[in-house]
Amino acid sequence: MFFKKKQKHYEPFDLERPLLSFAKNDAWTIRDACEGTQIFGATGSGKTSGSGQAIAKSFLNGGFGGLILTAKKDERATWEKYCYEAGCLDALFIISPKSGYKFNFLDYELNRAGDGAGHTENLVSLFFTILEIAEQKSGGSSDPYWERATKQLLRNTIDLLSIAQGRISMMDMYKVITTAPLDYEDVQDTEWAKHSFCYQLIKQAKQKNLSHSKKMDLDFTIRFWLNEFPNLSDRTRSIIVSSFTSMADCFLRGVLRDMFCTETNIFPEFTHEGGIILIDLPIKEYGQLGLFAQVLFKYIWQQAAERREVYKNPRPVFLWVDESQNFITSYDQQFQTTARSSRACTVYLTQNLPNYTAALAGGSEARAKVDAFLGNLQTKIFHANGDHRTNTWASDLIAKTWQYRSNLSSSMSNDGKVFFPETTGKQSGVSHSEALNYQVLPHEFTQLRKGGYKNNLLVD
């Protein structure tokens, strides 16, 4: 008598619930998704339309919420199609200049739920994430001194505004920094004091009834603006000031001002309830503006995902980043170390390893950062690729095994009998050896199918 094996029932967001099946007994589960995914493949290899599409649709069909960053103009249409086919088009929120969705990131960070809301260091980290990506793209210095000095500038700007007026805006930060004293003559000049927004805030803050802790913060802030800042060399001051103002300038005009510095009617937390947020500011169209906006929203979304109480709402959320070399920051590695416990499913797609190294300004330090980040993405998918470093790295990941080899040898000899070749002798033998070799050789990745009609639309 034969009994049919009872199919296991899974709760919708059970970590062991299969999302995809690669073979009869090889399921890719929600748990696997939460451990992060990296997809490599050359242009035209099928990484987006092949494994990328399969994973994306499994997330949508599974009821996941998510954030999608865009590098190319056609990505919005692609995801609209995916959502329509999955029956969740109504859950798709598109942030674009014409959509009407706005996100005042400073107001959000000051007023969001949680004990960390409004803390100066959190706001400094938020700004520094944008500054980091700007420095990466410009090939700027990564000298720790400039990082510390810029953070000090931001910290004292935020504290002064927070204590004096109880609110912070990008424009007010800009005004504080650009009206600060440049030397001790300014500090003693009554005419400068009369017209300096920075000095007027200092006067206003002194009149506040503050706690002992806030008084100490204000004292340090005043010392910075009236003693330390004007004592900086012109070169040092100009570098740290321009680090902020060159970035802030983008948020003080046009698209970024209207979308990210006015009001808030969309929140990262929408994704925790199954919403899908797509930022339609592709960098191929909007350039640096699109990059700054998306990196900013990604950072805030990552932190919101880490703060949520998964035991109350176990719905997985995903972060989808195609052409991911454009959007990678140092915080990604830190986020990925705890993403599984937050049920955050990161999917990054790029052509090759050198893309990441170049994005992080190259060098051994950049390689170490890339290795640390990729080490925390447990699922790695390799499509057709012509990059030697990526293919060799893939072969190393798959590892080597001990393989047996047999060698057949033969030889012929006539022992010097020139006149009687028919007496020639023949010898043969077989030898065996064991060697440690790649299971998949690097060159095999160059031969994978890329789809198209000549491959019957199949992608390896």
Predicted regions mapped to residue ranges:
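P-loop NTPase motor domains
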Residues: 2-14, 18-24, 28-344, 444-458
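Conserved H-loop
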Residues: 71, 349-352
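Short gly/pro/ser/thr-enriched loop/turn and capping motifs at secondary-structure boundaries
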Residues: 74-76, 99-101, 353-357, 389-390
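P-loop NTPase motor core of the ASCE superfamily
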Residues: 141, 145-149, 159, 269, ...
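Histidine- and/or cysteine-centered catalytic micro-motif in compact active-site loops
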Residues: 282, 351-353, 385
